[in-house]
Amino acid sequence: MANKQITLYENLRACSYTPFYLAQTLGFFEEEGLDINLQLSPSPTETAQGLIDGRADVSFGGPMRVLMHHNTDDNCPLICFGQVVARDPFILVGQTPNPTFCFQDLIGPKIGVATDVPTPWMTLQDDLSRAGVNPNSINKSVDKTMQEHTVLFKKGELDIVQVFEPYAQELLESGGHVWHRFSTRGDIAFTTFYATRNFVNSNRFACRSLIKAINKSLNKIHQSSAAEISDAIRPFYFPYLTPNAYENIINRYKDSKLWPKTTALPVESFVRLKAALLSGGLIQKDIPYDRIVDQELSGPEGE
């Protein structure tokens, strides 16, 4: 019997998505009876809208986008399943060392905030508020991409930048210093699969196969060296990185517990993300977990 074909939208190219790339290069999807047509989404907005309009079957990205759609449409068909990136992959990089970082240190310096997608600022502003710092009090640059902020940081025009990998690695190589890893916040359901409820219900076995493949990938990541993972992925997805650079990125993310042991999607992780989006005003409705997440499908053992 031929494998089930699935068009899978990749939200954007990022090192935090390593489990997806590993599942593709090592053939885990194929082992589970899937023929994956992996397409890089033209934009983060399209990653969700393309599912609704039928241009893709499944996407991987942040539940934030699904929450935004449900916030404006009570009949939104999108649903998440499977936590693949559990923690926040973003990092604060500063021009000078700051081994005793606290959020009050962000009052004053010029900060390049990541606004390529909404979640990084939403979670940062929530962290600031919880630490007693008014998010409006910081001197932030928000009208440029992470790539542009990286260039400005190297020129000395920004004191701090909020970036994910591989931008952080690039800045560390050029003399920057890690101030803070947002992964220390704990699990926050940063990245999942999502699809329309109709697709999930009509293709339950295929969605279950996606989950099985990613659990294989997560297990492989936790059992393998950074060099082994890099060798399997880098030539295909990050050829511009040196082996040492990608290995450093993988080790930092593994040390940060960015990738969970399994795809189970706990209520607590979802609630922590939702709280940040509510506090930042990105969403106004307190949308229930069961409306957004297919919990039974998410677990490693299935239904």
Set out the residue ranges of the language-model regions:
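Conserved C-terminal helix/tail region of periplasmic/extracytoplasmic solute-binding proteins
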Residues: 274-303
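Short amphipathic alpha-helical segments at helix boundaries and their inter-helical linkers
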Residues: 56, 60, 154-155, 254-267, ...
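Secondary-structure end/capping motifs
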Residues: 202-283
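Phosphate-coordinating loops and pocket residues in cytosolic domains that bind phosphorylated ligands
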Residues: 108, 173, 294
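Short, glycine-/small- and polar/acidic-enriched structural segments
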Residues: 2-133, 140-143, 159-165, 179-181, ...
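Pocket-lining segment of extracytoplasmic ligand-binding domains
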Residues: 148-238
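Short polybasic/polar patches that bind polyanions
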Residues: 24-25, 30, 129, 172, ...
